[in-house]
Amino acid sequence: MTPDRPVPDRPDTIGPAVDHGAVDNYTPDSGARQEIVWQGKFITVHKRGRWEYVGRARNIRAAVIAAIEDGHVLLVEQYRVPLGRNCLELPAGLVGDDDDCQNEDALTAAGRELEEETGYRAAQLTDLGTYYSSPGMVSESFTLVRACGLQKINSGGGTAGENITVHRVSIASLSGFIASKRSDNVAIDVRLLMLMGAKLLEGELA
């Protein structure tokens, strides 16, 4: 006899069933013509029906790096002009933003950005999938990359014109570190939530 195997919990779907092959059923605006309202070097403003949203120009994507090893994670802090203050983030960078590397892949870009921003080189980079951070107003996606086998090769800090501070933070003390930065008026990147996830949902970080 084959032993009984536990049946995984299935999520409950609440609301009408959606035919994922019928895109026009999603919203009255899904079939509207997409217009380019404005385009710069790095971003494009689109309008489709009633919706206005922003996307990356020239098929530029982003790579976000989760560099976690020996119970520590690498974070970066830098001034962000749209926020008008410093922001605490995971290392990240654009993929295919330079004219001579428009066809580069996310793992290549992630390795380069990790070295430039943090000064660490990864022996292994793993693609953890594509994600969308604010799909109601931004069409940009990012590839989450796990970096392992870290070796310090320089001081990091970014390229010319960047002034990046590198933090190597214990996972065990991460919530306290983030709280301290928040009290110093440092903005917190939403992607840090994945490092805090379970504890945050359980109310341990309230």
Describe each region flagged by the PLM.
Residues 2-21, 25-28, 86, 127, ...:
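Nudix hydrolase/Nudix homology domain
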Residues 29-70, 78:
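Acidic, metal-coordinating catalytic segment for phosphate/diphosphate chemistry
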Residues 36-41, 81, 131-142:
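Acidic pyrophosphate-coordinating catalytic loop
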Residues 44-47, 134-153:
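Active-site-adjacent beta-strand/loop module that shapes the phosphate/pyrophosphate-binding cleft
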Residues 45-47, 66, 75, 144-146, ...:
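Conserved hydrophobic/aromatic beta-strand scaffold that supports enzyme active sites
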Residues 56-112, 158-160, 164:
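Conserved Nudix-box catalytic region and its N-terminal flanking loop in Nudix hydrolases
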Residues 69-72, 79, 148-152, 171-172:
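Short loop segments at secondary-structure junctions
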Residues 121-128:
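A short coil-to-beta-strand element that immediately follows conserved catalytic motifs
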